[in-house]
Amino acid sequence: MRYQRVELHNHSTESDGEMTAAELMRWAEKEAYGVVALTDHNTCSGHEKAEKIIQEEQLHIQLLKGIEVTTFYGHILALGIEHMIDFTNLDPRAPEKFLGKLRAAGAGAIGLAHPFCIGRPVTAGCRMDLEIHDWNQIDYIEVFNTSGGTEAMAGHIMGNRQALEFWEEKVLEGYHLAAVSGKDIHQKPQKLPVMITYALLEDSGEDQMEGEEKAVLGSVMRQKTIITKGPLLHAWAEKEDLWIEVDHSSEYENWNLKWATCHPVLRIRGKQIEKELPLRFTKSTEKIKIAGVLKEEQEADSQREHTVVLRMYEENCQYENLLAAGISVRWKSGGNEE
């Protein structure tokens, strides 16, 4: 397993951004992103320009094409799509037909941008007011929008805390949804300690063969993403045991230097359990077994599929101490993770 730093929500001067598509790609290269999506409002006109600068200047990033479908009822992110479609017939009370058209037009993953943004009357249309009935039509939720800066600066406006809790509820209901962050870039971002997204990719080389941007799209569809301020981890279940593999190599927020003095706390939440467990990091890369912690979840119903969601905190489980989130573990009784 390897981790790829990605940014999946960005704008250029093709819509309401201040950087051209070329400037955005150069910025992403400088910031060591691996894959960057260009999701201008209701247009794909920047895709060709972004591809051109990547090729001409031999940048090391990959472009993931996309759109932010911008309506008065919410903003829909469509990744993998290469042309805008007509959305004048979008029914906010039954948007599934339109979501199907997005998929048919090439959208590989469909997500909700800043669903709990403050909305009317301050930012009309930014809050998700679509009445979604079939959540199987949605592939991911942007649970941290960091366009307003840190949580202390703009969390009450962007509604990130609500979005994270909503994502967890939907996942525990059984929906297969990935969680991502989004810088929602409109101008060159400041360097602030905000959540970023990593995609978990396979080591086999198969991902590189199909293209890194397609591999990232696949990670979103498989819910193999993590939102983090530094620590990289993935988790899986083996019967009633939870396993976590942590990697402290990320230089984001100097995590590669800070991890040894960290006092992490893992919060595990399922339908039957909610536990807070202190962890101890001893090596730069290690596997940690938490024996028997999933037993109650399994015993509640031995036939069904089980899911837990994880968060990692520093010191205690106060929201402002959140280090990593957006991690789900799904398994069946008597077996391992799906």
What is each stretch, according to the model?
Residues 57-62, 136-137, 175:
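A short helix-to-beta-strand connector/capping loop
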Residues 128-150, 199-214:
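Structural recognition of alpha->loop->beta junctions
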